Amino acid sequence: MRAAVAIFPGSNCDRDMIVALKKITGKSPLKLWHKDTEAPNLDLIVIPGGFSFGDYLRCGALAARSPIIKNIKNHISRGGALLGVCNGFQILIEANILPGSLVRNRKLLFTCRETTLEVQNSLQSPFLSSFNTGDCLNIPVAHNEGNYIANTELLKELEDNGRIAFKYKQNSEIETDYNPNGSLHDIAGILSKNGRVLGMMPHPERSINSLHGGTDGLKFLTKSIEEIVG
């Protein structure tokens, strides 16, 4: 498994992701700095969470213009897998790798808590091939701008073509705040047209130890890696 984690000034979840990937694969992933203009052939690149460039202008806006983005787009064109988590998802949208927008949470407050994700009837994707529609994962979120919005046409295209990976799930009829940010259609993550790029707001790397709240993130990352290299 040839994996790498892309790191920007202000990234703060890169270490957690590196620990998670090493726990699964047995070796540390390569670290790609935002100024790197060359990268080896890789199976997977992960853009982790954090506050790249201090979230100036917009979350992910400056990072999306870093030299490494060209390499990341070349990686995608070669068929490589790409995962963007939280700020990584924001960067993918700002770089026009994934569609839509991520704006301030509906309550205009930072949110940090556990959420339940429901796997959707998605197109063939290595990130979801080992899961069934309706499977649930408990994975935490921590963000201020995770409210996914898109126009009606794009939302329909995402729904009709199986490009919605996860939705926040309501666990009971009396639960009213299951959607932590107000995302349209309860969207928590979306896929590229070929299913090999996934952007998601929840943090799987923060759910890899039963002593720290659960292991659903480890389950998700493990199955994703197995499919990517399989």
Describe the role of every protein-language-model region.
Residues 34, 74-77, 105-230:
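Amide-donor transfer/coupling interface in amidating biosynthetic enzymes
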Residues 88-89, 123:
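Short, flexible active-site-adjacent loop segments at beta-strand->alpha-helix junctions, enriched
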Residues 1-85, 92-99, 103-110, 118, ...:
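N-terminal beta1-alpha1 cap of cysteine-dependent amidohydrolase-like domains
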